[in-house]
Amino acid sequence: TEELQPSFTEGAAVFHPRYLQVGEDQVPLLLVRSKIGLVNAASAVTEAISYSSNCLGVISAGTAGGLARGINVGDVLIGENYTYTDADATAFGYARGQVPGMPESYDGQADEWQDALEHALAALEPVREQAESPWEVRRGQMLAGNSFVTAHNVKDTREAFEGAISTDMETTAIAQVCHNYEIPFIGVRCVSDLCGPEADQDFHLSVDVVAPRSARYALQLAAELWTEAQLEALDLAL
């Protein structure tokens, strides 16, 4: 990416206006680095949305803890829906993870992104296959909360959220903000740690490895979304 404007800090986040070169186009991006936690992430994405009069969508990149069995460190995870690990109003008839008055989970409203996502995954498949240690790409429910999922509570978390593949401390908060603003959202995370590793599994991979991998997928998706948007605009013009 190339600098569009100087970076600046607002609240709990640093904002980096950038251009992403896609063919002959320079795609405007606002890269945001928030601090850790649900409130910090929600504050950052709300601020970011306020800077754009035409936001195509939000992509959350970063690291995550692998939750589902069979996931390994280094795997790339694509969110299909998002909920909270530590929201519990079940005593009042709500589902585990559901905030009262809000949906059980957030689907990201990104159904229209499926073609762009498939193109992005296909474009990066040769990179994945030729890697010294190929990783898997998995899709499913992503969890987020203010508490870590560890060996002490991983069994309960897996039972409560059977389809969940990962947990972190930001994704669902971003999904909720995007839901409120009716902006498409998707989480793209790379597994740095395992919440409940098996005896023969590596359970940690350096952030210097996993963060760039997540970013690569996120930027490829952004490029595909821009290309798709330009083609749709051309069709409308015709």
Show where each model-derived region lies.
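Structural motif
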Residues: 56-59
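Mid-sequence, gly/pro-rich, charge-dense loop/helix-turn segments that line enzyme active sites
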Residues: 67-162
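His/Asp/Glu-rich mid-to-C-terminal helical/loop segments that flank catalytic regions of hydrolases
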Residues: 195-238
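A C-terminal functional module that forms or caps the active site or interfaces directly
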Residues: 145-200
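Active-site-proximal beta-strand elements of phosphoester/diester hydrolases
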Residues: 29-36, 139-144, 188
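N-terminal short beta-loop-beta anion/metal-coordinating cradle
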Residues: 1-50
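Alpha-helix C-terminal capping segments
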Residues: 47-52, 70-71, 175-184
